[in-house]
Amino acid sequence: MVSGVGGSGGGRGGGRGGEEEPSSSHTPNNRRGGEQAQSSGTKSLRPRSNTESMSKAIQQYTVDARLHAVFEQSGESGKSFDYSQSLKTTTYGSSVPEQQITAYLSRIQRGGYIQPFGCMIAVDESSFRIIGYSENAREMLGIMPQSVPTLEKPEILAMGTDVRSLFTSSSSILLERAFVAREITLLNPVWIHSKNTGKPFYAILHRIDVGVVIDLEPARTEDPALSIAGAVQSQKLAVRAISQLQALPGGDIKLLCDTVVESVRDLTGYDRVMVYKFHEDEHGEVVAESKRDDLEPYIGLHYPATDIPQASRFLFKQNRVRMIVDCNATPVLVVQDDRLTQSMCLVGSTLRAPHGCHSQYMANMGSIASLAMAVIINGNEDDGSNVASGRSSMRLWGLVVCHHTSSRCIPFPLRYACEFLMQAFGLQLNMELQLALQMSEKRVLRTQTLLCDMLLRDSPAGIVTQSPSIMDLVKCDGAAFLYHGKYYPLGVAPSEVQIKDVVEWLLANHADSTGLSTDSLGDAGYPGAAALGDAVCGMAVAYITKRDFLFWFRSHTAKEIKWGGAKHHPEDKDDGQRMHPRSSFQAFLEVVKSRSQPWETAEMDAIHSLQLILRDSFKESEAAMNSKVVDGVVQPCRDMAGEQGIDELGAVAREMVRLIETATVPIFAVDAGGCINGWNAKIAELTGLSVEEAMGKSLVSDLIYKENEATVNKLLSRALRGDEEKNVEVKLKTFSPELQGKAVFVVVNACSSKDYLNNIVGVCFVGQDVTSQKIVMDKFINIQGDYKAIVHSPNPLIPPIFAADENTCCLEWNMAMEKLTGWSRSEVIGKMIVGEVFGSCCMLKGPDALTKFMIVLHNAIGGQDTDKFPFPFFDRNGKFVQALLTANKRVSLEGKVIGAFCFLQIPSPELQQALAVQRRQDTECFTKAKELAYICQVIKNPLSGMRFANSLLEATDLNEDQKQLLETSVSCEKQISRIVGDMDLESIEDGSFVLKREEFFLGSVINAIVSQAMFLLRDRGLQLIRDIPEEIKSIEVFGDQIRIQQLLAEFLLSIIRYAPSQEWVEIHLSQLSKQMADGFAAIRTEFRMACPGEGLPPELVRDMFHSSRWTSPEGLGLSVCRKILKLMNGEVQYIRESERSYFLIILELPVPRKRPLSTASGSGDMMLMMPY
């Protein structure tokens, strides 16, 4: 559906003409391509591989490029563009010249035109000199061109002009501050004024390859304060909409989508707002709509995948909001410096003009203006998506698109608020999708269990004759079971004669497979497909034995597709040649003709799992008939092993009890009735209640304050059901005279206690005493006592505190915050809390974290307090800080809410130790853990010997070559020691993994990793090509040398293991110097480790990008190295090209720079910038 993308400027339907790759070097391999509805054929029973998905994506790119060329040629020849015919004649098998694809990407990315509602200026970042501008810039800025420019009076707006001369002095200062920011987009919009006219503009900045692009959109007020207030008001409206989303009952994605379109329409005022969902086969569907009553409905509309090209979808993950003000407006040319080698990239510009075909489509459907917003969710790394490119797992789920029947311009602050709403919608949607997936997995597992139980208790026919049946496992129209030559059909299924013909075809053409799935039997090559007709188009079959088969069938797709606008009325003038939603719908129906809904990955997983279970069940049933005597002998051995395991677990349990009793944090436990059965020394000290007195008391009735009873009751009931909660505040009574009846506040984590049968028998609470902080916060919020004395006291009991006014500007930043973050009060006061303070100064972990923080802050300003919100961030030196945020409304003496107070709580080492003790209760991998611990222990002795030998060699007289060899040996020994000494993989997951910081030379790392690969290179007959400039080896950088060495060695050895024998392996290293925002220097290093051919198998690459699961030790090693690299703010990609495959590792490393500290000691210490 061309209009579908609205502002995206994408295909015939909204995809074409706008959002393509940032550069032509971003090949189709760089995005996840789903299996197209247009293509079919046979697939293995296992879910489709990522290689197959990438192949489909490449095919999609070629189709997109061909359609683009047809449209361009029709314009040049004066002929009309026949939309439907072009779709029919453009096939997936046809090849497209590479230059045609490059031209297609470049045409839209570097089109050279903008929309006329604003103007654009491109600037060299280092000199502020203009390198390009739109032709309407002079008019919008009120600059009159010189009739005859001279040296004394040069042209005011010309190439080489300092852009600061066009704006007021205060505006120039704001631009200078933005240009040095690490993330320039976080400061958008910058409020600036034209020097000639004083007219205000929103300056929206982003970096490109040749400089900085400044998009200038006219603002509606001349007071910057009003602009800030307007932006905050837009954010408040978005927060209100987000609150409505969060208040919805869970488990209803349709209701969530319906609510978001209503919210967006209320927020923006567009005539129509829709939610587009991209299906697994990449075609789109309108799943929710809010519109003006007189407009034609689009709800239920489906459109082919080609309507929104792959390039457009990729770019929506980069530029998430796109507005077209008037599709009929004449675009404005961008002129640029002649010295630039190619047209400027306008992908990130808010003003970029739509492509002609998209404007034409919008006009055909009566839509003049549009706003398109990406809905991004976290892709499931475990499903293997995105692993081939090595990219992170952000996935474009769909779009929210707004249409208007007249021109409409939404100011940037409101668009930013909409983006904010979309991020929250994506988070909420992601949770709902995960919940739906979990529910589906549970349902499938339950069905599988019941089916297997039927199979063992009754005859095999029970899985089709009883309920549930195999039809309940996946969505289908029919199913069948062929068992020992007897046929059991269900629902819409072929006849017995037809199914035997299908089996003969399977055994003749797919005998070496374990099964097959297809959405079109005809395209899969089955000669009898026509006889089956539309009733049986798609089929999935699982081979149980050589003579037993399970089948599932699906009818053609078109019968399930309903759209209210599909009916063609006589007065409608459009036809198949014109680009229109009705044309898109008919094209989609043509594409899916004689084709069923594709089999989804989760469905293939369910079928394959049932296949394995049934195979094992059949084998066990047969084996049970002949092995009863053997079983009787073996069983006592299993019992003895069980007793030994119980003894070991008992020893562990006794050790756990001892650790809990002596812990320095409060720990207590209750049985299933809520009565105390555990009470350690610390909680006894805090409450004045001894262990003997506490035992048997009711936690809720006897020990908790009445106002806290509801919270604790809820916490208990959820934990007894297995739902464990964290960071819940509990208010406990005290019982000793010394405590004078004062309350004790403890923040607890609830942990379900289980017996040896895994039944929940109680709840254990691990807590942290926050009484002192609570008292301070209560006084502070109520403005009791001396305000300044509390906030700025150096007393360690005063927590880190910051405050925001009603416009989210920072107005308080106490000493504890200065110490925690490294940023002084004077540096942050007056800046925007969200974006500037937290975002630019203190970086957060991604846009989702920024969105969640903004919601919390605005909720507090709106009067809704938040307690113990997880708030991790990076301090000034790049150190990762884990904190809990409490945000409270800030109230004036008159009781009016005037902002927010925020308190940070840093978990104490004691609490972290207690949580580590809690995690040790997991004994599933107890035996393997013991073996690993044994290996790590005994390997330390020879390591110690190696270290001693190396130290002796260091004291001898060595030449330069010998010194280098010794240095390499020492580095490898240190690498082993670090790996053996730090086995806590969970700390890598949660970001608390400690990275050391030291100066080192890149050449030392290269020597160490090459030395580890030499034996394997010789064994496999491989030539090592080192493309490393000598000057790079001598560069001194700052970071964790051993960890960098570890992960680079792992990636290199993996490449070597899977390189073809007697071939080559290449190491390429390049670097680019970079100036950081604080004036420090850094280098961006790119390591490329390549080999010819396909390289690593897809299963291993999938293991590498798993978030939690792995199937091989080598996959685990790659996964751990990827996560360590991520903690260093680096990234790794695995890229397959036509003739080679390679790892691309990107890491920024600061160059040590000495700067004297302003201390009285004058000891010559250094301040070093650290990236992580």
Swiss-Prot record:
Contains one covalently linked phytochromobilin chromophore. CDD domains: HATPase_Phy-like (cd16932), HisKA (cd00082), PAS (cd00130). Expressed in fruits, flowers, leaves, stems, seedlings and roots. Residues 252-433 form the GAF domain. One of its GO terms (molecular function) is red light photoreceptor activity. Residues 24-54 have a biased composition (Polar residues). Changing V980I: In strain: cv. Kas-1. One of its GO terms (biological process) is photosynthesis. Regulatory photoreceptor which exists in two forms that are reversibly interconvertible by light: the Pr form that absorbs maximally in the red region of the spectrum and the Pfr form that absorbs maximally in the far-red region. Photoconversion of Pr to Pfr induces an array of morphogenetic responses, whereas reconversion of Pfr to Pr cancels the induction of those responses. Pfr controls the expression of a number of nuclear genes including those encoding the small subunit of ribulose-bisphosphate carboxylase, chlorophyll A/B binding protein, protochlorophyllide reductase, rRNA, etc. This is Phytochrome B. The gene is PHYB.
